[in-house]
Amino acid sequence: MTSPSSILLYCRRGFEKECAAEILVQTQAAGISGHVRAKENSAYVVFVAHEPEILANRAARLRFDALIFARQRIFASGPLADLPVDDRITPLLDTAAGLQRRYSTLWLETADTNEAKELAAFTRKFERPFAAAAAGLLGGGPQAPRLHVFFLTSTAAYLGYTLPDDSAPWPCGIPRLKLPRSAPSRSTLKLEEAFLVFVDRPETMLRPGMSAVDLGAAPGGWTWQLVRRHIRTTAVDNGNLDPALLDSGLVTHLRTDGFRFRPSRPVDWLVCDMVEQPSRIARLVADWAADGAFRYAVFNLKLPMNRRYEEVERCRGLIEERLAAQGVSHRLRFRQLYHDREEVTGFLELVS
């Protein structure tokens, strides 16, 4: 078998520098030398390993869920350039057969840019004949690697694989969520995606009858996600809340400052989408956690224009330092979700 020579990462357009910085930190920590190729506004980054065999041997040390800005991470070969127009399939199949013996499924993808989306008609047309030709490599079962073909143009592509338990479960790393008609704002999709990304035990972590606090709740997009799961919610905001949420019987609206409010007793969930300096939000969440005021928290950090990766790591440090001083066991993750913009979403779980 051939070792993958690179790591392909999808990201939000404009965040290539941050995505490149964190994959360099992660690979260096694993003792994997290489360099990155990151073109501004391309919506993808490539880490090129200097020694592919070391990348293959140490790939298990590179956890996808530890990355912040990557939507998807693919162990890849390539790029395959100048694919013959009359036979793109053969070189792609040869490369796929060299990387893995069997795959569970096939995803043809492009970058999340307007320019790359012009390839959509080509990939739709190409998918059926390529899948038919690759049938002998597919059908490896749900735990087999996924086969990805990432088209740069109609004649150039990266080909690689992801492992189902260490990757995003959606093509292009993008969950296709539909805005519910009754939701008060589009921000509701951020919390829905956050639950999909961070909550690995929904039957126990998002049970009906749980309690929550939503800081900066108005007009109620995040509260709506809690109410639809029958979670009793205290919505804290000086602004107006969607009347339908109040009619649900599950919401108490408090017109007060989200930074001053504290619940009289611990709640199951804290969610926070207040527009404020990221370090101030991080300290607020750390204060609640140090007091044992919640079990789980989802919060957004609005990022500055510059040094965005460094700012997230600074906020991570603020939370980690405070909880370490209090002896609070926890799990902390960050991810720039598809429905995030100039922000990242944090998830904090207190471990008893």
UniProtKB/Swiss-Prot annotation:
Signal sequence, start to end: none
Annotated catalytic residues: 302 (proton acceptor)
E.C. no: 2.1.1.186
InterPro entries, per database record: RlmM_FDX, RlmM_THUMP-like, RNA_MeTrfase_FtsJ_dom, rRNA_MeTrfase_M, SAM-dependent_MTases_sf
GO CC list: cytoplasm
Example GO BP: rRNA processing
UniProt binding sites for S-adenosyl-L-methionine: 187, 218-221, 237, 257, 273
Principal localisation: cytoplasm
Complexes and interactors: Monomer.
Family: Belongs to the class I-like SAM-binding methyltransferase superfamily. RNA methyltransferase RlmE family. RlmM subfamily.
Annotated protein name in UniProt: Ribosomal RNA large subunit methyltransferase M
Lineage of origin: Bacteria, Pseudomonadati, Pseudomonadota, Gammaproteobacteria, Methylococcales
Underlying gene: rlmM
